[in-house]
Amino acid sequence: MPQKQLILASTSKYRQELLSRLAYSYSAQAPLVDEEKEKDPSLAPQALAEKLADLKAASLKAADKVVIGGDQLVSFEGRIIGKAHTPERAIEQLMSMQGKTHDLITAICVYDGDKKIAYTDITRMHMKKMTRAQIERYVQLDNPIDCAGSYKIEKHGIMLFDKIESQDFTAIQGLPLIELGKILENANL
């Protein structure tokens, strides 16, 4: 039986770096999904992350492929906090969350041919009380405009938090490698 091709349905450099830690040969491809068009405001944050991860993986699935799709978002006070896209918006997002707790939701969906395996990690993030000047300094350091919640935990973003409650620290960065590793072991790659 020929070996299946492993595909990461993502152009995220963060997810690519993470997947490389599992030591599988893979290729990264842009998912064939218009993410903005698929965002349904009526869905709960976890359901939305799971839907987007599924759509991304499903868009590239094939019998001879194992395809990984992922999505990550922040749920804060009943609303979704997405990517800021500008430093000013990142500062406002962080100011609104400082001194409070939010959920970082990381969903993955893996298609092994037609077989679907899904997993969601929810991490409780307890942000410190901070001044605007401290937050502005952080945004200058990391420029986290392309990250859900406007922080890069793998860089200086760790200084924003009092406590992080997580089953898998790599989920915070974009892929829950502990669970993904188990899924891929069973995929006979």
UniProtKB/Swiss-Prot annotation:
Presence of keyword Transit peptide: no
Compartments it resides in: Cytoplasm
EC number: 3.6.1.-
GO molecular function, one term: nucleoside triphosphate diphosphatase activity
Lineage top rank: taxon: Bacteria
Keyword Hydrolase belongs to the record: yes
Known cofactor(s): a divalent metal cation
Catalytic activity: N(7)-methyl-GTP + H2O = N(7)-methyl-GMP + diphosphate + H(+)
Transmembrane feature ranges: none
Keyword list, A-Z: Cytoplasm, Hydrolase, Nucleotide metabolism
Gene Ontology CC annotations of this record: cytoplasm
InterPro entries assigned: ITPase-like_fam, Maf-like
Site (Important for substrate specificity): 14, 72, 154
One record GO biological process: nucleotide metabolic process
Active site location: 71 (proton acceptor)
Enzyme category, top tier: hydrolase
Job description of the protein: Nucleoside triphosphate pyrophosphatase that hydrolyzes 7-methyl-GTP (m(7)GTP). May have a dual role in cell division arrest and in preventing the incorporation of modified nucleotides into cellular nucleic acids.
Family: Belongs to the Maf family. YceF subfamily.
UniProt name for this protein: 7-methyl-GTP pyrophosphatase
Species name: Bdellovibrio bacteriovorus (strain ATCC 15356 / DSM 50701 / NCIMB 9529 / HD100)
